[in-house]
């Protein structure tokens, strides 16, 4: 892998939603980026949950393939009793104060892990949050908790963990202490461009206008598994509220190879323009 070079975007395909093993993904950050490059993606963003990026932004070369990486994150925020996710992108280096904000969010996740162990009476069966998480360098998610519950034989099936102890209705998980509007405001104040990750259509119709008024700039409409009609409807919601569109695989690596889906540059021009990056001829 060659070291990062300057950003320059012309044409190609985008994957703006990816995860590594620094949050709930399976693979190392460099492997994720290399996999995207091998698939012909030309602009990618590792968006680990509530963490600063592991790789610098810029242009990378893997063999004969080149790819541009954006410094980014996926930030969780509470709204109307729900957990929503905000994709936060930077055109250059993520500011240090925002990196520290994200490390604080990762430390909250570590505290939530230990609080869950205590609330569920599982302190003898589940390990404490690792030092890396307590230091804000690893984001512990419900995926990690579900795996720990399976390994400890507290549950016998993956879905049982999410339907039972990890269901927010169980009251065993600490509620988020950051609201979605606060997540938007913090990202914008740091100079980021932000997009609402994987919104449900009804939620987008109900709340996109409200969030746009708070500073939201984009809506994730392109992702594997959604049909053309839903994608078009999300596009209409975005157009109504003057939001650009983003897209990505949300690939974690656990189900095998990265999906062949990628977001075409012709749909991502408004996003790239919002970042202030040159697109060339």
Model-derived segments and spans:
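Hydrophobic, aromatic-enriched interface-forming segments
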Residues: 123-176
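Catalytic beta/alpha-barrel core
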Residues: 46-49, 170-177, 195-200, 220-225
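Conserved, well-ordered alpha-helix/loop/beta-strand core segments that scaffold catalytic motifs
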Residues: 173-200, 206-214
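Active-site gating loops and adjacent loop-to-helix segments of metal-dependent hydrolytic enzymes
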Residues: 78-110, 147-169, 262-281
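A metal-dependent hydrolase metal-coordination microenvironment
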Residues: 8-140, 214, 219-257, 264-265
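Acidic/glycine-enriched edge-of-secondary-structure segments
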Residues: 13, 17, 165-169, 186-195
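N-terminal amphipathic alpha-helix/helix-capping segment at the start of soluble metabolic enzymes
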Residues: 1-11, 185
């Amino acid at each position: 892998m060659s070291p990062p070079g300057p950003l320059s975007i012309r044409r190609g395909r985008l994957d703006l939603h990816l995860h590594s093993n620094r949050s709930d993904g399976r693979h190392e950050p460099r492997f994720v980026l290399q996999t995207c490059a091998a698939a012909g993606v030309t602009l990618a963003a590792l968006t680990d949950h509530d963490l600063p990026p592991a790789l610098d932004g810029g242009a990378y070369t893997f063999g004969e393939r080149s790819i541009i990486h954006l410094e980014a994150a996926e930030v969780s925020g509470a709204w109307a009793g729900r957990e929503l996710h905000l994709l936060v992108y930077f055109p250059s280096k993520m500011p240090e104060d925002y990196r520290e904000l994200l490390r604080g969010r990762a430390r909250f996740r570590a505290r939530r892990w230990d609080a869950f162990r205590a609330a569920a009476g599982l302190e003898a069966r589940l390990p404490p949050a690792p030092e890396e998480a307590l230091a804000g360098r690893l984001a512990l998610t419900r995926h990690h908790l579900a795996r720990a519950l399976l390994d400890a034989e507290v549950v016998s099936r993956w879905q049982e963990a999410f339907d039972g102890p990890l269901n927010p209705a169980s009251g065993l998980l600490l509620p988020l202490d950051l609201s979605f509007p606060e997540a938007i405001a913090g990202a914008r104040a740091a100079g980021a461009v932000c997009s609402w990750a994987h919104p449900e259509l009804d939620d987008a119709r109900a709340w996109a206008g409200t969030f746009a008024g708070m500073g939201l700039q984009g809506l994730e409409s392109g992702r594997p598994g959604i049909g053309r009609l839903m994608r078009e409807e999300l596009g209409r919601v975005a157009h109504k509220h003057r939001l650009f569109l983003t897209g990505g695989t949300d690939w974690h690596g656990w189900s095998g190879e990265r999906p062949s889906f990628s977001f075409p540059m012709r749909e991502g021009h408004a996003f790239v323009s919002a970042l202030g990056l040159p697109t060339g001829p």
